[in-house]
Each structure stands twice: as C-alpha cells, then as structure tokens.
Regions:
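DNA major-groove recognition helices of helix-turn-helix
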Residues: 107, 111-129
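N-terminal interaction/assembly modules
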Residues: 1-83, 100, 126-129
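Helix-turn-helix DNA-binding module
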Residues: 98-110
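A short pre-motif secondary-structure segment
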Residues: 91-92
C-alpha cells in the first residue's frame, strides 16, 4: 500500500517531508521499545587496563539521555494514538505500521480521517511539526 496523505477534506495536512518522517518514526515504534529495554540491561565493556581510555566520558549519562529521548517518542506516539477512538485504533495502527488495508467494519474515509489526525497529532507531539 502506498504512503500518501489525504488532500481532500483534510484539515490535518502536513508538508510531505514532515508526513513521511512522522510515519517512519511511528513505524520504528517496536524497535524503540526494544532499545529502551536493552539500554537498561546493557553494561559497558570491561576496561582494558590502560590509564587513559578512548571511551566517552560518562557512558551511563549518555545512555540515560538516549533512553529518555526514546521514551519521550514512545509516549508521544501512544498519546497521539489515544486521540483515535478505540474502535478505530487497531485499523489505523495496522494501516500506518504494518501497511494493512483498513478493516471493513467502517467506511474507508472514516479510517482515513482518523489516520490523518493520528499522524498529525504524532507529528506535533514528536516536535516534528
């Protein structure tokens, strides 16, 4: 399924680059969740015994900053998805993340409107737009 933004009867229009960046950030959701968990479980490599190393100054702080940024993005996507009514969430999520067609339980335009709003809300909350 092609990635395009609805143009007619859509008050949630984004610039093309912003739209695609937001869609790909949403598609990266599962990897971000896995990375947030792995940052908690990872440990630095053992020291090599030399007095001066080539590593960064504070690896724990840099991992903490990285994890906070990932969690901020995850929360922004979750909050944007909550703006979609519960009965349409699965269809909208499947359309954006898994590129599935919309379910047949509601009209395609209804799902399209909610998908547009979801992507717009995610772009605003992620700070992309």
């Amino acid at each position: 399924m092609r990635d395009y933004q609805r143009k007619k009867n859509n008050k949630y229009i984004l610039p093309g680059a912003v739209y695609m960046q937001t869609v790909w950030t949403i598609r990266d959701y599962q990897r971000m969740k896995e990375e947030a968990v792995s940052l908690l479980l990872s440990s630095p490599p053992p020291p090599d015994g030399q007095p001066k190393g080539t590593g960064t100054g504070d690896e724990v702080a840099s991992k903490a900053f990285r994890r906070e940024e990932i969690l901020r993005k995850i929360k922004a996507i979750d909050t944007a998805l909550e703006a979609v009514p519960r009965e349409y969430r699965k269809g909208v999520w499947g359309s954006v993340v898994e590129r599935k067609s919309f379910p047949r339980d509601a009209d395609r335009t209804t799902y399209g409107r909610w998908k547009s709003r979801f992507v717009f809300e995610a772009a605003v909350r992620l700070g992309i737009f």
